[in-house]
């Protein structure tokens, strides 16, 4: 149920009847304060100006045409022309009942789209580090949300599995295998890459061999392809362990590395030349874009093929967008890539649009994100100033959560403690990131993220178990409540019910904007409203069975909404804490 959409349509029709243009925007929003009702329509200001009348006068006329019978108990004009809408308790009660009848909690299925989501994208022969965390978990939350809504989602893990460095890596792997240490060396990917680079920089004979190997690999030589595949396989096997620990839905089947687009690159360069978009400039092939200016104010040149014949990331990204539209039949493509890549993507997409590879009707969206910072406000590093491996970060999260859980539950059996520590530790790392607006940098702080108060995973997980405990104490099964009516008489019952019914609106925003922090804020607010409801509206000691069962149903929908909401974020819930 999307109440905002329902009210928007009703207000829009009333505005048109009052003389507003057919494309008017009612601007119906959830009210910020209880005294302004549940929703507020703010669109009178802009429309009244166009009509040459006072906003309040327009609001009064709109009210004469606005029929919210059975939806709102009160509608009033506030200030210069805001329309405040107070939802009818009977309407709330009926919709709570409806939500409890479906596994989807009453969430409608939008028109199905094929949506490609590009996220995570680690590099081959390197271990995943904290720089991969944001793309991986924000992208996965978007994927889970879109899939829940009913879209066909294609996960695209754009792995860095191609480039000149592979000559160096294959030459080093070959050397290690000759010394019978190939598998052992690859167990430490980071060390393997570092040693290969050191030899490449210091040993000219090795460097020459590496350069020859690049040519052989790129020409499709089977021996070199096999060595390359070995590097990719070992890396992705290690990455899969990290994905599974993070409770992220990516698998090996989702890998669509840079190498996938190699066969397309010569054809794309030739096509861009034939279309007059690409020209020769100082031996290289360049596309000049009027939308981007260089320091001299001239159109910026974007190189798509170097004079030695090599291709660039831009060429691959052009091919990638084309493939996602033509082969994967995407209706929409989302890229979870950090904000530093924004101009690069905009240039690639400008070329894609000019060449007609992806029509304007198919959005290409850069859902960019900021950096993860240490407490000093600088990029998050180890004490020695090195890059933090993602596996090490998750180990520390687990260890800290283990101590925290053991402290609170000294008698908990070891296997149960491990399961709980895993849910809390991994959940804390993910939620701390997901609860921040992705477009900003955020400070990584262990103490804050593992706290049992505030907008944190441990607080949300505890809030869920607290609602479940009401049912354990009530000693009643969900099925026994099915026939019981929902009755809303108290303000706090109404506030909780209205917020519960805003779940679909929240999912819709996350799906449209790719902003999981909106879901985190909603769930945190919901947990707070339940707390207040629990305190002021006795459940187990209610005045009669009818009120008790009605309140139990509100508690039940709260538990289901918290669990489902956290699931769309990839945060595990537990039954007890």
From Swiss-Prot:
Domain of life according to the entry: Bacteria
UniProt GO BP: arginyl-tRNA aminoacylation
Name of the protein this chain belongs to: Arginine--tRNA ligase
Broad EC category: ligase
Chain positions of motif 'HIGH' region: 122-132
GO cellular component assignments: cytoplasm
Chemical reaction(s) catalysed: tRNA(Arg) + L-arginine + ATP = L-arginyl-tRNA(Arg) + AMP + diphosphate
Oligomeric form and interacting partners: Monomer.
Keyword Protein biosynthesis applies: yes
Enzyme Commission (EC) number: 6.1.1.19
Pfam families, alphabetized: Arg_tRNA_synt_N, DALR_1, tRNA-synt_1d
Keywords assigned: Aminoacyl-tRNA synthetase, ATP-binding, Cytoplasm, Ligase, Nucleotide-binding, Protein biosynthesis
Encoding gene, per UniProt annotation: argS
Protein family (similarity comment): Belongs to the class-I aminoacyl-tRNA synthetase family.
Localization annotation: Cytoplasm
Gene3D superfamilies associated with the record: Arginyl tRNA synthetase N-terminal domain, HUPs, Isoleucyl-tRNA Synthetase, Domain 1
GO molecular function: arginine-tRNA ligase activity; ATP binding
Species of origin: Escherichia fergusonii (strain ATCC 35469 / DSM 13698 / CCUG 18766 / IAM 14443 / JCM 21226 / LMG 7866 / NBRC 102419 / NCTC 12128 / CDC 0568-73)
InterPro entries to which the protein is assigned, alphabetical: aa-tRNA-synth_I_CS, Arg-tRNA-ligase, Arg-tRNA-synth_N, Arg-tRNA-synth_N_sf, ArgRS_core, DALR_anticod-bd, Rossmann-like_a/b/a_fold, tRNAsynth_Ia_anticodon-bd
């Amino acid at each position: 149920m999307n109440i905002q959409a329902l009210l928007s349509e009703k207000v829009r029709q009333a505005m048109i009847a009052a003389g507003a243009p057919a494309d008017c925007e009612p601007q119906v929003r959830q009210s910020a304060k209880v005294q302004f009702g549940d929703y507020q329509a703010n669109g009178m200001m802009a429309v009244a100006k166009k009509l040459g009348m006072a906003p309040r006068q327009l609001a009064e006329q709109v009210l004469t045409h606005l029929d919210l019978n059975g939806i709102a108990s009160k509608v009033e004009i506030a200030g210069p022309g805001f329309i405040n809408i107070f939802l009818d308790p009977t309407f709330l009660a009926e919709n709570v009942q409806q939500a409890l009848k479906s596994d989807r909690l009453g969430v409608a299925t939008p028109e199905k789209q094929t949506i490609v989501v590009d996220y995570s994208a680690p590099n081959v022969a390197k271990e995943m580090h904290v720089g991969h965390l944001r793309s991986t978990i924000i992208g996965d939350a978007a994927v889970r949300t879109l899939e829940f809504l009913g879209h066909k989602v294609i996960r695209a893990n754009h792995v860095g599995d191609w480039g000149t460095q592979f000559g160096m890596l294959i030459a080093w792997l070959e050397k290690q295998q000759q010394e019978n240490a190939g598998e052992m060396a690859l167990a430490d990917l980071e060390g393997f890459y570092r040693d290969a680079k050191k030899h490449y920089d210091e040993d000219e004979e090795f460097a020459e061999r590496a350069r020859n190997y690049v040519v052989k690999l790129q020409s499709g030589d089977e021996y070199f392809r096999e060595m390359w595949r070995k590097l990719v396989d070992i890396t992705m096997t290690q990455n899969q362990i990290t994905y599974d620990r993070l409770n992220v839905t990516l698998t090996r089947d989702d890998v669509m590395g840079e190498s996938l687009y190699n066969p397309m690159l010569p054809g794309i360069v030739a096509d861009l030349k034939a279309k007059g978009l690409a020209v020769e400039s100082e031996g290289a092939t360049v596309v000049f874009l009027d939308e981007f200016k260089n320091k001299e104010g001239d159109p910026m040149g974007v190189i798509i093929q170097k004079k030695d014949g090599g291709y660039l990331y831009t060429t691959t990204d052009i091919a990638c967008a084309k493939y996602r539209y033509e082969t994967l039949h995407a209706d929409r493509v989302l890229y979870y890539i950090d904000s530093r890549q924004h101009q690069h993507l905009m240039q690639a997409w400008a070329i894609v649009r000019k060449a007609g590879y992806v029509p304007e009707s198919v959005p290409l969206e850069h859902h960019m994100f900021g950096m993860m910072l240490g407490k000093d406000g600088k990029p998050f590093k180890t004490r020695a100033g090195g890059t933090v491996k993602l596996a090490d970060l998750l180990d520390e999260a687990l260890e800290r959560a283990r101590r925290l859980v053991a402290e609170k539950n000294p008698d908990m059996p070891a296997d149960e403690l491990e399961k709980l520590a895993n849910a809390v530790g991994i959940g804390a790392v993910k939620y701390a990131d997901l609860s921040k607006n992705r477009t900003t940098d955020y400070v990584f702080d262990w103490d804050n993220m593992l706290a049992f108060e505030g907008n944190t995973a441990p607080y949300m997980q505890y809030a869920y178990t607290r609602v479940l405990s009401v049912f354990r104490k009530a000693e009643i099964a969900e099925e026994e409540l099915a026939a019981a009516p929902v009755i809303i008489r108290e303000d706090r019952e109404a506030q909780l019910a209205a917020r519960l019914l805003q779940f679909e609106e929240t999912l819709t925003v996350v799906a449209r904007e790719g902003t999981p922090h909106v879901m985190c804020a909603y769930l945190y607010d919901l947990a707070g409203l339940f707390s207040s409801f629990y305190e002021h509206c006795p459940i187990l000691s209610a005045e009669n069975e009818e009120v008790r069962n009605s309140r139990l149903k509100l508690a039940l929908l709260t538990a289901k909404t918290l669990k489902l909401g956290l699931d769309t974020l990839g945060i595990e819930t537990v039954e007890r804490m």
